[in-house]
């Protein structure tokens, strides 16, 4: 039978059991990585919060209930201060929300939120946007780490590129927790 997601076979019971043996270690390592990055940021906030920081809007997908979603969801955009600009945007009609500009000095295209225009409508994506755009993460340890990250910013978005690393570790922890749940399903 067909298996979704590009997987070419189901796990055997032996393969599943083998992976179950290590998943708790992976979760522990992921928690340690989140803690390490948190401690680094707290040890020198001026460096970690200021280095390369640039304020911008954020764009990501979230689940219909606002949870972190890495694959299929709805568009959410926030401005640099955290106010929601777009919520529950239809990904299949993204062109109504996002436009691209071409610059004569580059082969790249420069996307922006239509409602803000090309000068103010550019945005960041990736883990820093996803973790700050979602309302929660459906993995308890990762969600606690997300809340701690949001508290670190005083409830306002943070914009330093070094903070991408912290949010990458939060997403890694979420993935490990979700893998554990799938292995026990």
Task: Indicate residue ranges for each PLM-predicted region.
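Active-site bordering "gate/hinge" segments
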Residues: 1-185
């Amino acid at each position: 039978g067909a298996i979704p997601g590009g997987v070419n076979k189901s796990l055997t019971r032996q393969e599943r059991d083998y992976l179950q043996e290590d998943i708790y270690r992976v979760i522990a390592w992921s928690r340690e990585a989140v803690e390490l990055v948190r401690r680094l940021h707290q040890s020198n906030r001026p460096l970690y919060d200021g280095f390369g920081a640039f304020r911008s809007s954020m764009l990501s997908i979230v689940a219909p209930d606002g949870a972190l979603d890495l694959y299929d969801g709805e568009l959410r955009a926030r401005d640099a201060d955290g106010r929601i600009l777009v919520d529950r945007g239809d990904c299949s009609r993204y062109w109504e929300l996002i436009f691209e500009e071409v610059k004569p000095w580059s082969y790249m295209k420069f996307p922006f939120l239509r409602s803000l225009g090309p000068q103010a409508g550019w945005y960041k994506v990736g883990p820093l946007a996803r973790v700050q755009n979602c309302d929660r993460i459906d993995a308890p340890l990762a969600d606690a780490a997300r809340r701690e990250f949001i508290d670190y910013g005083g409830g306002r978005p943070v914009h330093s590129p070094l903070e991408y690393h912290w949010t990458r570790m939060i997403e890694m922890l979420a993935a490990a927790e979700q893998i554990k749940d799938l292995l026990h399903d």
